[in-house]
């Protein structure tokens, strides 16, 4: 049985907290953006879409540095937020923001693909029966896209757990405050005689990611089978 040290347990708790808060604050905006990209046509859509997915192709250090310039204590926005207690640089809230920026495109893409697979005629039928656009979305689109939303949520959560470049650039590597799983592994690899601890964290990361992705695949198949039986 693998026994974690108190420091490793603290790292795991912090990583899960950062990933969970990131997902909670990303889910509604990502669903809205995904719906807009899936259902609406407007001038500048290609530019908007490019901006949404840009973090996927940028070196993670670039978004991290931009976040530091924007939300650092002396940043463009950070200097005005700091007096209200909203400080992001070099604390766990900044780690949430960095993870959200890097995981948001994955969440949007998964939800967008799920919404695009929903037959728009079902939405129109709901509206014909008296549902508003919002009601049709909540009662028809959202339930039918639930498997894609779950998969996207798990991908975003796992991406947050593995975020390194943007996090270390924006919030540093502070024990007990911003040191998540990948940062802890990086720190241990800089020290002698820590191979066993590194392997424990690697096995822990693999276990969490494997279980999360397995559950997403299982739930997706379950939903498909359920709809097949319903039909």
Predicted regions and their residues:
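Transmembrane alpha-helices
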Residues: 24, 108-111, 119, 133-166
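Interhelical loop and adjacent transmembrane-helix boundary motif
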Residues: 1-7, 170-210, 218
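C-terminal transmembrane helix and the adjacent membrane-cytosol boundary/short C-terminal tail
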Residues: 112-123, 127-128, 135, 195-231
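Transmembrane-helix boundary motif in ABC transporter permease subunits
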Residues: 21-52, 65-67, 114-116, 121, ...
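Periplasmic/extracellular loop-to-transmembrane helix junction in inner-membrane transport proteins
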Residues: 1-24, 36-40, 187-196
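Non-cytoplasmic
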Residues: 72, 149-187
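Membrane-interfacial helix termini and adjacent extracytoplasmic/periplasmic loops
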Residues: 64-100, 170-174
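Membrane-cytosol interface at the C-terminal ends of specific transmembrane alpha-helices
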Residues: 88-127, 140, 152-156, 218
């Amino acid at each position: 049985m693998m026994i974690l040290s108190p420091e490793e347990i603290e790292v795991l708790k912090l990583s899960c907290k950062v990933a969970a808060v990131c997902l909670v604050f990303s889910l509604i905006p990502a669903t809205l953006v995904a719906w807009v990209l899936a259902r609406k046509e407007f001038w500048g859509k290609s530019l908007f879409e490019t901006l949404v997915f840009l973090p996927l192709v940028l070196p993670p250090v670039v978004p991290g540095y931009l976040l530091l310039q924007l939300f650092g204590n002396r940043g463009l926005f950070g200097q005005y937020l700091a007096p209200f207690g909203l400080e992001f640089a070099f604390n766990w809230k900044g780690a949430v923001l960095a993870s959200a920026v890097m995981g948001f495109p994955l969440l949007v893409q998964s939800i967008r693909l799920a919404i695009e697979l929903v037959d728009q005629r079902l939405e129109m039928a709901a509206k014909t029966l008296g549902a508003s656009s919002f009601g049709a979305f909540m009662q028809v689109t959202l339930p039918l896209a639930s498997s894609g939303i779950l998969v996207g949520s798990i991908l975003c959560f796992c991406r947050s757990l593995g975020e390194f470049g943007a996090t270390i650039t924006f919030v540093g590597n502070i024990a007990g405050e911003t040191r998540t799983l990948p940062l802890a592994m990086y720190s241990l690899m800089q020290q002698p005689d820590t191979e066993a601890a590194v392997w424990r964290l690697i096995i822990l990361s693999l276990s969490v990611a494997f279980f999360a992705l397995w559950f997403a695949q299982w739930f997706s198949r379950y939903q498909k089978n359920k709809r097949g039986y319903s039909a």
